[in-house]
Amino acid sequence: AGAAVSQVWTNNVEGVKCNTQTSTGSFQNCQDVSTGEVDVAVATSDVVLNAYNGTGKFADIGKLDNLRVIGAVYTSVLSGVTLKSSGLTYIHDLLGKRVAVGPAASATENATLAAFGGMGIDSSNTSLENLGLGDGADSVGDGILDAAFGFAGLPIGGQLNLAATKEIQVLDMTQEEIDKVLAGNAAYIQTKIPAGTYTGQDNDDKTFGV
C-alpha cells in the first residue's frame, strides 16, 4: 500500500517526489515516523493507537504522541485458516496446537494475540510461530503447523493459495470473544469474512479488523 500511495503522490502532486523503503511493518513504521527517520508511513490503526498511548508493545518505549493520522487505505481483517481435515472450527480450538501468528512485532501478531488474549491461549500452552503470511499458510498445507493467521485486506494471498490446493476451514469466533477483543482496543471493529472469500468457504465467519 505504501509504495502505491507514494507513486500516486509522485505522479499527481506538483513538487512532490516520494522515495520508498521496506520495513518490518506497523511497529517499526510508527517508531520511524516519530523519530523523523521517515516522513510518512503506513500502519494499522490498532498499532497506531497503542503507539500514541504508549500501550501494548509500546509500553516500554513510551507514548509516541507526535504521530498524526492523515488518511486510511483499506480494512485489514484477522483471518485464521486450518485444514478442514483438522476438525478445528473456532480460534479457541487452537489451544495446545502449532500456530503461525505472523512475523514478530507485526500487525498480524498483534491482532492474533489480541484474539488469543480472551481465550487463555498464549506461548505457555500453545506453540506460537513467527512466520510471514505466505510461509505460515504453506506450513499449514505441508502439515507442519495446525493453523496460520493473517491481518490484511481480504482475500489474503497465502491463504488464497492454500485454499486452491487444499480443503481449508476458516476459523470462526463467538460473539462473546469478539466483544472481549473490541473492549480491549478501541481501534477494532467487528466484521466478517464473507462466504466464498476462499474456495470451499460456505458460511460467513465472525472476526474483527481495523
Labelled PLM ranges:
Residues 19-20, 39-43, 69, 79-81, ...:
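Structural recognition of the beta-strand scaffold that forms the well-ordered cores
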Residues 45, 56-57, 122-210:
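Pocket-lining segment of extracytoplasmic ligand-binding domains
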Residues 63, 70-77, 163-164, 174:
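Short Pro/Gly-enriched coil loops immediately N-terminal to beta-strands
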Residues 72, 91-93, 206-210:
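Short, flexible turn/loop "capping" segments at secondary-structure junctions
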